[in-house]
From Swiss-Prot:
This is Probable septum site-determining protein MinC. The gene is minC. It comes from the Bacteria. Keywords: Cell cycle, Cell division, Septation. Interacts with MinD and FtsZ. The keyword Ribosomal protein does not apply. InterPro entries: CAP/MinC_C (IPR016098), MinC (IPR013033), MinC_C_sf (IPR036145), MinC_N_1 (IPR055219), Septum_form_inhib_MinC_C (IPR005526). PANTHER family: SEPTUM SITE-DETERMINING PROTEIN MINC. One of its GO terms (biological process) is regulation of cell septum assembly. Cell division inhibitor that blocks the formation of polar Z ring septums. Rapidly oscillates between the poles of the cell to destabilize FtsZ filaments that have formed before they mature into polar Z rings. Prevents FtsZ polymerization. Belongs to the MinC family. HAMAP family: MinC.
Amino acid sequence: MHKDGVLIKGNREGINATIDMEKFASFEDMLNMLIKKLSKGKHFYKGTTLILNVNLSLIKKNDIKKLKESLLNEIELNEIIFEQLEQESNIQTKIFNGVYEGKTKFIRRTVRSGQCLNYPGNIVIIGDVNSGAEVHAAGNIIVLGSLKGSVNAGNTGNKKSIIAAFLLEPEILKIADVITISPDGLDKPRYPEIAKVKDGTIIVEPYLANKYI
């Protein structure tokens, strides 16, 4: 651990930050130090994933929310993954605590043929995506309607992104650099579906709410 309580390292997927809360007098002191350090490389960190290793039992729930919002606004990260840090042995345990998916843009209309949406975060469309329309997002794409155009989630390379719709019938569906084209004449189910990458291939399965909470 670095003497000031914050250790930052880059990796292939983004950044790792390890925080020793016991070296700070308050949560605010830690947050200020973390933002100060990340700000030095803001140009390089923008739009990347931050894996934050910290003893979550030492941070209040409201402060965790504040930490997420501050980092997204100040550093413009795409995603934050929290991992529990076992302070006593100074090793990181592999307890997954959840993913904060980043900024989300809500579109309250139908995206029509010839229109193209692009956003450096998640996109939620309350409406349809018609054939001939395009939607591109660095994060997830959720369509509360029928999806019949071309979509690309995780377009900065995030293969953990998903695409979901009440009626999933895209012309072209792409997650990161993995692409699939819907076959013609295939009867589609009339229930919500979700597409994701598994073992290097895009799979589509029924959306089960409890599974993705």
